Amino acid sequence: MDMGGNGMAMPPPPAPVKKARYMHMTFFWGKNTEVLFTLWPGARGGMYALAILFMFALAVLLEFRGYRVLEARLARRRAPRAAAALRTAVHAVRVGVAYLIMLALMSFNGGVFLAIVAGHAAGFLAFRAGLCGGGPAPPLEEDRKNDPVCC
């Protein structure tokens, strides 16, 4: 069927050129990486150091959230509904931080990995092993029930 175009069809528009992005699937050691957000920290050394400190702080925060003295204090509040709402909000923050840490680990950057492990170790030492506060945090009753090692 002839549309009167003399057989001359317009060429298709050129495809947009996209910069190829590479995601590491093995650990690598370098500051040129992306952690959590596109182009962050990028190729800037100062931003990479900030990313390392941020991941360290997130890991310490996650260990603080596991601090059972805080949980026990929240459980002893007089208003059970308000305490339940507060405990739920704190739990939501804990889960969100844990997912952010997991996503950062998926960058496979060795420095990020070491910062997260060091943050967990520092947080454990400070809050769970008893360096801060009045000794090791006592376990809650539900922890004892769910512990597979406990008799």
Swiss-Prot record:
Keywords: Cell membrane, Copper, Copper transport, Ion transport, Membrane, Plant defense, Transmembrane, Transmembrane helix, Transport. Its main location: membrane. The chain crosses the membrane at residues 42-62, 97-117. It is a multi-pass membrane protein. Pfam families: Ctr. One of its GO terms (biological process) is copper ion transport. Involved in the transport of copper, in cooperation with SWEET11 and COPT1. Contributes to the removal of copper (Cu) from xylem, and thus to the sensitivity toward bacterial pathogens such as X.oryzae pv. oryzae (Xoo). This is Copper transporter 2. It comes from Oryza sativa subsp. japonica. The lineage of its organism: Eukaryota, Viridiplantae, Streptophyta, Embryophyta, Tracheophyta.
